[in-house]
């Protein structure tokens, strides 16, 4: 079990490329933290600095109150699972899981107990005598997890462990890792570029862009209260719709749209002095409905109708704006069809057009 404190962490390479900038985060014992962001945002580099595989250029890393910047990786009581399984092909599952413990010269009885315990948790008991070549991708990833589990480390680090698996197996392994966290009751830090993994697994999500933390919060918080346009566009699939416009009285207006703003949201805009400058309205696909209400109804033309099974994703053109609408599958929708859509303005978000920061 472990608490981590990352204080003003920096990573600058010799060519002066600033990969991680002033990273600050407090991680409580037993949390499941997910670092998420696009490729090159610094999430894996941050994880590797925690592991001791990358030198920290500035700031302090504390684990249980002890400064770890200069402590070698092997002495940090950390276990790590990588994107590639890195299993020894000539060894059995048992020997792969036991290898690290043998190198530490741990007693054979203890090794046997730990390996069998981990195999039981991961559903690998019947595969212990097999070699990796006889296993599926998901089973190999479980062996890699098992190799980390048997170390009984204070912190588990996972660097995109599911990205080599197919879509169905990723969903299955997502659930297995979440169950594993509950069983082990330990601190886990997980890196992914997949916002769905972040939303479904994390206690808290750390969203990064260009080496800078954009927002830290529970999945529900970052989804419903995004700090800026990047977060609101990155978290959620399909992404949030954005429309640039201005405020005129109690209306959000563009050249072709006029939508009534609820009093509560209008009061915030007035407080933040956003009435006379360009702003961006954001609204999620599920908050635009293909049925008319008393107000805030707009005519839209469907350009693409994607049926995903339980629902449609409607890609529409609305007054020159491209908007995605999430609709139930009870009705049929077709490309080229004209429909009336309703904006639920109680669910909309407003952002400063210049800074892209949420107006609250």
UniProtKB/Swiss-Prot annotation:
Organism superkingdom: Bacteria
Record Pfam families: ABC_tran, OB_MalK, TOBE
Keyword Transport: yes
Alphabetized GO MF terms: ABC-type transporter activity; ATP binding; ATP hydrolysis activity
Residue ranges constituting the ABC transporter domain according to the UniProt record: 4-235
Sequence positions that bind ATP: 37-44
UniProt keyword terms in alphabetical order: ATP-binding, Nucleotide-binding, Transport
TM segment ranges: none
Entries under InterPro entries matching the protein: AAA+_ATPase (IPR003593), ABC_transporter-like_ATP-bd (IPR003439), ABC_transporter-like_CS (IPR017871), ABC_transpr_MalK-like (IPR015855), ABC_transpr_MalK/UgpC-like (IPR047641), Mo/tungstate-bd_C_term_dom (IPR008995), NA-bd_OB-fold (IPR012340), OB_MalK-like (IPR040582)
GO CC annotation: ATP-binding cassette (ABC) transporter complex, substrate-binding subunit-containing; membrane
Annotated SMART domains: AAA
GO biological process terms, semicolon-separated: carbohydrate transport; transmembrane transport
PANTHER family assigned: MALTODEXTRIN IMPORT ATP-BINDING PROTEIN MSMX, OSMOPROTECTIVE COMPOUNDS UPTAKE ATP-BINDING PROTEIN GGTA
NCBIfam families: PRK11650.1 (NF008653)
Protein family per UniProt: Belongs to the ABC transporter superfamily.
Protein's recorded name: Putative uncharacterized ABC transporter ATP-binding protein YcjV
Organism expressing this protein natively: Escherichia coli (strain K12)
């Amino acid at each position: 079990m472990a608490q981590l404190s990352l204080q003003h962490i920096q990573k600058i390479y010799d060519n002066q490329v600033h990969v991680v900038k002033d990273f600050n985060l407090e991680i409580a014992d037993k949390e499941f933290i997910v670092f998420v962001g696009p490729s090159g945002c610094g999430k894996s580099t941050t994880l590797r600095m925690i592991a001791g595989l990358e030198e920290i250029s500035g700031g302090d890393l504390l684990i249980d109150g002890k400064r770890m910047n200069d402590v070698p990786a092997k002495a940090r009581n950390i276990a790590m699972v990588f994107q590639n399984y890195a299993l020894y092909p000539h060894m059995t599952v048992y020997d792969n899981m036991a290898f690290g413990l043998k190198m530490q010269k741990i007693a054979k009885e203890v090794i046997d107990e730990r390996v069998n315990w981990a195999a039981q948790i991961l559903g690998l008991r019947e595969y212990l005598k097999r070699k990796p070549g006889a296993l599926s991708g998901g089973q190999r990833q479980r062996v890699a997890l098992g190799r980390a589990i048997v170390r009984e480390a204070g912190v588990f680090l996972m660097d995109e462990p599911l990205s080599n698996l197919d879509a169905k197996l990723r969903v299955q392994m997502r659930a297995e890792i979440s169950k594993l966290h509950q069983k082990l009751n330990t601190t886990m830090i997980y890196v992914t570029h997949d916002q769905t993994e972040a939303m479904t697994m994390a206690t808290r999500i750390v969203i990064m862009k260009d080496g800078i933390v954009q927002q830290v919060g529970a999945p529900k918080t970052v989804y419903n209260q995004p700090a800026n346009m990047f977060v609101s566009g990155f978290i959620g699939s399909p992404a949030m719709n954005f429309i640039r416009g201005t405020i005129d009285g109690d209306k959000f207006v563009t050249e072709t749209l006029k939508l009534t703003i609820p009093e509560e949201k209008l009061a915030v805009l007035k407080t933040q002095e956003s009435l006379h400058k360009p702003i961006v309205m954001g609204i999620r696909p599920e908050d635009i409905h293909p049925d008319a209400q008393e107000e805030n109804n707009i005519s839209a033309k469907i350009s693409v109708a994607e049926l995903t099974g339980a629902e449609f994703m409607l890609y529409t053109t609305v007054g020159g704006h491209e908007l995605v609408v999430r609709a139930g599958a009870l009705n049929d929708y077709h490309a080229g069809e004209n429909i009336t859509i309703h904006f639920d303005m109680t669910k909309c978000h407003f952002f400063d057009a210049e800074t892209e920061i949420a107006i609250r």
